[in-house]
Amino acid sequence: MPTLNQLIRHGREEKRRTDRTRALDQCPQKQGVCLRVSTRTPKKPNSALRKIAKVRLSNRHDIFAYIPGEGHNLQEHSIVLIRGGRVKDLPGVKFHCIRGVKDLLGIPDRRKGRSKYGAEKPKSR
């Protein structure tokens, strides 16, 4: 434990907070190219085939990004926009693809939470 005199001379050193989305370079979104599209199984209590894409960002970082929603049209060499946001039951997947932007289409006929999935407003009768 430091003495009062030592604290006056040097002060305390602040802990550095780690950046969880370092690949984004402090940007809200980044563009990237799909290198591979695949599925992965989630951690223990859950069971599914979650769709993920390996993406090379414009700053040359290679990351895994989750593809939200039911069904997608992504394939190799597709251009996608990436945002932060991890997937709790997929270790190592810390990013999301944004639907309805670039080559990743929105979900047709989606009625609820449309803004999150790039869906058009349904025609009212």
From Swiss-Prot:
Give the CC-aspect GO terms: mitochondrion; small ribosomal subunit
Does the record's keyword annotation contain Amino-acid biosynthesis?
Answer: no
Q: Which Pfam families match?
A: Ribosom_S12_S23
- Which SUPFAM superfamilies would you find in this protein's record? Nucleic acid-binding proteins (SSF50249)
Keywords, in A-Z order: Mitochondrion, Ribonucleoprotein, Ribosomal protein
User: What does the record list as GO biological process?
Assistant: translation
Q: Name one GO molecular function term.
A: structural constituent of ribosome
- Gene3D superfamilies membership: Nucleic acid-binding proteins
Matching entries from InterPro entries are given as: NA-bd_OB-fold, Ribosomal_uS12, Ribosomal_uS12_bac
The function of this protein is:
Protein S12 is involved in the translation initiation step.
Q: Which NCBIfam families match?
A: rpsL_bact
Q: Quote the protein name from its UniProt record.
A: Small ribosomal subunit protein uS12m
Query: What organism is this sequence from?
Result: Helianthus annuus
Q: What is the lineage of its organism?
A: Eukaryota, Viridiplantae, Streptophyta, Embryophyta, Tracheophyta
